[in-house]
Amino acid sequence: QSMGGYVAASIAPRLRPHGLILMCPGAGMWYGCARRADMVTQSGKDYADLEGLVYKMAFNYNMAAHPDPFEEAKGYNGPVIVIRADDDKLVDDESCKRYAGLYQVAEFVRVSGGGHNFATIPSRTACEQAIWKFIQDNL
């Protein structure tokens, strides 16, 4: 999920897994990450807190050195499901649609509620059902 989806999408063209499950893949963090890190460190802090996810600004500087996440993800040809909650404040619909558009066999599923972590029983259930269907259909 999130940064894990970003990493999975980036490594999939080389690893070539049987399928790819991307839950709210976090490519959006890549855009402007060094500039955001500069602003945070200028305020006297060396970390950020996003919905309880605390990370050092060195992480942002390391991310800035990587290529565009969508370029890294190109070249994987297996089945893909991209899942996002419709009220996710950290990963936008456009990033998820862009990931889905990179792949030949991809499905984009939007789950109602639950935020970035699918933090309600109905959203978690819908997410798990979408994943189970994807596994049954593709793997």
Label each residue range with its predicted role.
Residues Q1-G4, A8:
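Gly/Ala-rich beta-loop-alpha elbow adjacent to hydrolase catalytic centers
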Residues G5, G115-H116:
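Conserved glycosyltransferase catalytic-site signature
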Residues I11-A12:
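Aromatic pocket-lining residues of Rossmann-like dinucleotide-binding sites
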Residues L15-E94, R98, Q104-R110, G115, ...:
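The alpha/beta-hydrolase serine catalytic core
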Residues I135-L139:
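Short, hydrophobic alpha-helical segments
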